[in-house]
Structure formats: C-alpha cells, structure tokens
C-alpha cells in the first residue's frame, strides 16, 4: 500500500505488515504486473523493470533473481550466478585462487566435519596463525563473524558461526589493517571503478550495528543518515596513486570473474606495513547502492540509477537475442518401447 512509500513506517515492521497487502508478480504477454491475492484480484501496479535493493539470504544470493528470471521480468543488477557466487565466501575464494587474485590464507569446512573430527579442523586453523577471523560462509552484514586470538576463542567462534550456516570459513586476520572499498559499475563488457573509500573503525571489523544502525565507536564523526552511507570514512582513501590504481584494477577483475552486473562494492583489506592488498568480498547489492562513492566520482545519484537501469535493459535485450533451447518433443514418437537406447544391441 501507500504506507510502503513512507520511510518512517519501516521503523515499526509489525504495524507496516498489518496494513500492507500481499501481491504476486506475473507476466502476461510481456506486461509485468503486481496483482493482489484473494477472490477479487486487482492490479496494483504495472512494472517496467525491477530494482532489487535487498539484503540477506533469499535476496542477495540469487534466489530473488531466479524468481525474476522465471517470471521473465527485467531487473537491475547481477544475475543468478553472479549473485550466488558473491554470497558464498568459499566458492568465490576458490575462483579468485584460480585467477591468481590476492586473498588471505583460509580453511573451510562443513559443520558435520567439525563435529566428526574437531581436533583436525582446529589443527588446520592453527596452521594459519592467530589472530583469525571466523565467518559463516554464506551470510553477509558481519552476522556471526568473530575475531579470535587463541584456541579457546576459536572453538567458541566456530560454535557461534555454526548457528548461522552449515559451511564455515576461517581466515588469517590482516594486521596493520586498512579497510578500503571500491564500487564497480558495468557488466562483463565494460567496468568503471569509483573513487576509493577508507573505512574508519577502532574495531577489528565493521559489525552489523556499524553497517546498518550507525553504531560503534569510531575515530571520526560524520553527519548524515544511518547505516553504510554514514559509516565513518575518508573519501578518497589515503593511499598512494599506485596502490589506488591497483585496487581499482583488482576490483574490476573481481567484477568480471564473478560475472557481476549493475553496481557492486568490492571490499579490500590492506596490510599497512607491507602494502599487500587482499580481496575481502564483493557486495552484489551494496548498502545505499554505494551512491556516496559515485558522487565522489562526479556521478550524481540520478545518473547512477539511469546507468544501472540502462545496463539492465541492454542485458535483458541481449539475453533474449540468444538461443537457449530448441523446440522439439522427444516423446512425439513414443510408443511404449524403450526408445533408441532400448533398440541398441
């Protein structure tokens, strides 16, 4: 309903849900519509294109993109594969390794493997050397992530991560840490890199509260809205030109390797002493669509949205020019026999 257009209503989800209507999305001869449920169905809205601005499982991980693909609706951003790869921290690292892209040393395992041979898993983790970062493999927003300095902390952190996922990843923590983010806009054919930001925090990593509720103690203070758009940052990042350009090139390599589209944000970890750069992870639907990075790159928010939508329309048209299936009925000559294979001797 109209209440969904009032951002203040999102402060109270229970009230919002009471007044909102459930709808379905359908495609009728190329016309995309939202329709109410129930006996007397009415068209709520006609759609030209969908702009997903969502977080979490079943949203960023390719699920909602798969639903939109099934319905046939054009949408902004990365497709099913890119979205799912961008959500699985283990698979994405395996891809980066195959392309010699820089990542921190890590080990991963399933929860059942940990319970079957806890000592062996702990032994592998110890070889990385403390401090370590323990993460659920498929969650974002820093949920379930723990920074650990010893064996006891490691075991507790693994137990915590298992509450959120069946697959766990343990990474060597980067010391002398500088956190830098770069947004990328484009598709597999062309990529633009934004101005870099340096994220300021006294914690080992940004928490969920830092990212979405604007909490946590930081070294600098800023004004603005809550969440990632108001996280304390320095723009542009305080890096030399060579390092800045290297980060931008790696960001574009990541974007292309995962077949991303639209706008994303690639998060980096830099060792301030050695100046080594490591890919942390991509965010296929970044908080605030990283508009603040593009504004710093002389691309206003309205222009960013226009370019994202233009890319989506182009991608939709290109896809429908490809041949993905052949119209044939393999059962047309079926007569109860075992078919061709059944006749072979």
Task: Label every model-predicted segment.
Residues 1, 186-189, 271-274:
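Short acidic-glycine loop/turn motifs at beta-strand connectors
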Residues 37-44, 83-177, 188-189:
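Active-site nucleotide/adenylate-binding loops and adjacent lid/helix of ATP-dependent enzymes
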Residues 74-75, 103, 132, 301:
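Hydrophobic beta-strand scaffold residues
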Residues 146-226, 238-246, 277:
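Phosphate-binding site of ATP-dependent enzymes
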Residues 1-81, 85-91, 110-120, 324, ...:
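ATP-binding N-terminal substructure of ATP-dependent carboxylate-amine bond-forming enzymes
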Residues 100, 228, 232-345:
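ATP-dependent carboxylate activation and anion-phosphoryl transfer catalytic cores
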